[in-house]
């Protein structure tokens, strides 16, 4: 009986400590999330000089990034495997 009471009390203390630690982390979470969203948003504003996988392209022009080639059939950049 004493052992079960001790385990129950230890479990409650552990639950309290974990809850307090997660609550303090949650206070910082919204700030971190907003900073990451705005950092990604700033990155999207930059344009690349070449087109990546799945971007539409014009065959014959060198618009795709290195290791990609413009498919004359589908008219989008695909991985260039060579021949």
Swiss-Prot record:
In-chain residues carrying the UniProt-annotated modification Leucine amide: 81
InterPro entries recorded: Huwentoxin-1, Huwentoxin_CS1
Propeptide: 22-48
SUPFAM superfamilies for the chain: omega toxin-like
Signal sequence interval, chain numbering: 1-21
Taxonomic superkingdom: Eukaryota
Described purpose of this protein according to its UniProt entry: Selective antagonist of neuronal tetrodotoxin (TTX)-sensitive voltage-gated sodium channels (IC(50)=1270 nM on Nav1.1/SCN1A, 270 nM on Nav1.2/SCN2A, 491 nM on Nav1.3/SCN3A and 232 nM on Nav1.7/SCN9A). This toxin suppress Nav1.7 current amplitude without significantly altering the activation, inactivation, and repriming kinetics. Short extreme depolarizations partially activate the toxin-bound channel, indicating voltage-dependent inhibition of this toxin. This toxin increases the deactivation of the Nav1.7 current after extreme depolarizations.
Family, as annotated: Belongs to the neurotoxin 10 (Hwtx-1) family. 15 (Hntx-3) subfamily.
Protein name, as recorded: Hainantoxin-III 7
Natural source organism: Cyriopagopus hainanus (Chinese bird spider)
